[in-house]
């Protein structure tokens, strides 16, 4: 199925009715966005940086307002998904941290306009890679709006040992003073190939 606004709203209303909170995750893409692909929505394909900034703001604010008006219990918003290599490529691809911050800041400002009490998470992959987190957040925090939570993905097959994850989490919690969330995780029973 699709996770367009209509479908996502129906799911979020059911989740709220069941007594749960909703983490609203903006991918800013027509398809799943991750470190290997951060493709701009087709309708934004020809936009420059300023137009992309405005589109992120408008889409985020309109979506937030739609969810809030429907009574959805949004308990956290994630601006972008696994942003290790940026978002809205090619304009927002690492190492262009100025544009990355421009786009993420637009999303954060829109969340704050809709409801300033909802915490914002910025999420990277590769939770065991401390150098990645330091480079990314050192660059973003020089240019970025304030946010509350750093999200990490942790898949041990790709992202290192639990000790590496632990060391990274301890370092970035102290370095940036943010709460941490493991936003994606999968722990296999075995690392052996199926025979």
What kind of feature is each model-predicted range?
Residues 1-17, 21:
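N-terminal carbohydrate-binding/catalytic regions of secreted carbohydrate-active enzymes
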Residues 26-32, 80-82, 186:
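Short glycine-enriched loops at secondary-structure junctions
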Residues 15-33:
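Glycine-rich, aromatic-flanked loop segments that form ligand/cofactor-binding clefts
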Residues 22-26, 75-79, 120-122, 148-152, ...:
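Hydrophobic faces of well-ordered beta-strands that scaffold small-molecule active sites
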Residues 16, 112, 174:
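Anion (oxyanion) recognition and catalysis
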Residues 154-157, 179-195:
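Substrate-binding cleft of secreted/luminal carbohydrate-active enzymes
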Residues 18-20, 116-118, 176-179:
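A short helix->loop->beta-strand "cap" motif at the edges of active sites that frequently abuts
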Residues 5-6, 34-141, 145-147, 159-169, ...:
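Active-site cleft segment of glycoside hydrolase catalytic domains centered on the general acid/base Glu
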